[in-house]
Amino acid sequence: MMTISLIWGIAMVVCCCIWVIFDRRRRKAGEPPLENGLIPYLGCALKFGSNPLEFLRANQRKHGHVFTCKLMGKYVHFITNSLSYHKVLCHGKYFDWKKFHYTTSAKAFGHRSIDPNDGNTTENINNTFTKTLQGDALHSLSEAMMQNLQFVLRPPDLPKSKSDAWVTEGMYAFCYRVMFEAGYLTLFGRDTSKPDTQRVLILNNLNSFKQFDQVFPALVAGLPIHLFKAAHKAREQLAEGLKHENLSVRDQVSELIRLRMFLNDTLSTFDDMEKAKTHLAILWASQANTIPATFWSLFQMIRSPDALRAASEEVNGALQSAGQKLSSEGNAIYLDQIQLNNLPVLDSIIKEALRLSSASLNIRTAKEDFTLHLEDGSYNIRKDDIIALYPQLMHLDPAIYPDPLTFKYDRYLDENKKAKTSFYSNGNKLKYFYMPFGSGATICPGRLFAVQEIKQFLILMLSYFELELVESHVKCPPLDQSRAGLGILPPLNDIEFKYKLKHL
């Protein structure tokens, strides 16, 4: 008589055989090389997740510039030749770039789909972002951010004894705290009826945001949030504060949020909590990548004496040209859009910091079967398959960026110290050479504001503070690979630094 263990063993073998026969895709003529992986459903997901860059490089060496991997039940075609990126984007009529993003948002934040095709709303969210994050709207948003950054960095009630003392703090923790508070106030305004509890509320939200953000990669991977009780509670608490009844009593709410409140109320069938969760999605999008990007920009600038010197000279010159005088009395400084855009050294520092730390995954879903025509050949793509670009491969390619792992603050400056816009790969000029914010239709609509708020932060840190690393020759912390594919990778460990207000 067969034992239970033997029965289970036979059952497992049968299941594996069924999987091999029916679940594994067979490569057809004209399709890219295929990696199914060994694990049902997951495919190559574990190998990809442990180190995406090395996984893709290994497959690039094995298969060439185009190959297909099964990841979490989906078939993903990776295009790894940066010279082909513009060719991919020319096939836009075959792509649905919204499907993945809408599905991910609903899954992670807990609202119904915001895709107008699903019938829950008729709002075109991309038009909303374009209208409120660019042009004249960007001017008012940047002005509010500059005011709020100065409010956070130089609070009006700061005792003189504290202003004269050196403060030692983790740099990532410092950037997280400052950028979250200033960014929250800029988007969602402030409750002037409760000034004493305003900061406590935001710091509570900061802690909730950290808890929720910690599990975000797992949510994107498809795990339900109910598996993470603390993160689920944190998400609901964050959303509670963003209900319309709470936002309506706040002053200086951004045009973006005011318009979204109006459109949610007039064009959607969302309940109050779902409306709040669509605002939570905006909060996450405004913070999750900006915070680590701010850290890397500040860290790399302070760590490089040449970068620190060049940035300080540029900022001092810009303030003098604008007639802005630094004062210990708390007078705010301000640079307009034109002045902020005319800071090529800071631009280059930020770009170089993001080049070294970004690991975004540019994704598009095939709406139908079609043939993808690239520089090095044509490939048949099946409906519902995913086309993916992983720009970190390009950002760290020595053929494009010599000595790619070294921070060079002037890498994006030409011989005239102006913005450098021409980069080459093996003698061929690249149309796309810097892509931390995505590309084409999927490019981040808030990228201009993100760069400006980082730039404003650096201007204020250079203007008001003396800055030092506790360990002057500290090594660059490794990147946290658990967030690969989501954007800017945070440091795996924090770096201590010292700061104190300058005597102006």
Swiss-Prot record:
Cofactors that this protein relies on: heme
Residues binding heme: C444
Family: Belongs to the cytochrome P450 family.
Catalysed reaction equations from the record: cholesterol + reduced [NADPH--hemoprotein reductase] + O2 = 7alpha-hydroxycholesterol + oxidized [NADPH--hemoprotein reductase] + H2O + H(+)
Topology in membrane: Peripheral membrane protein
Catalytic class of the enzyme: oxidoreductase
Cellular-component GO terms for this entry: endoplasmic reticulum membrane; intracellular membrane-bounded organelle
Pfam family, one: p450
The protein's name in its UniProt record: Cholesterol 7-alpha-monooxygenase
Described purpose of this protein according to its UniProt entry: Catalyzes a rate-limiting step in cholesterol catabolism and bile acid biosynthesis by introducing a hydrophilic moiety at position 7 of cholesterol. Important for cholesterol homeostasis.
Cross-referenced SUPFAM superfamilies: Cytochrome P450
Organism of origin: Cricetulus griseus
GO molecular function: cholesterol 7-alpha-monooxygenase activity; heme binding; iron ion binding
Keywords from the named record: Cholesterol metabolism, Endoplasmic reticulum, Heme, Iron, Lipid metabolism, Membrane, Metal-binding, Microsome, Monooxygenase, Oxidoreductase, Steroid metabolism, Sterol metabolism
Subcellular location: Endoplasmic reticulum membrane; Microsome membrane
Family matches, as PANTHER family: CYTOCHROME P450 7A1 (PTHR24304:SF1), CYTOCHROME P450 FAMILY 7 (PTHR24304)
One GO term (biological process): bile acid biosynthetic process
Superkingdom of the source species: Eukaryota
Pathway terms, separated by semicolons: Lipid metabolism; bile acid biosynthesis
Keyword Heme: yes
Annotated EC: 1.14.14.23
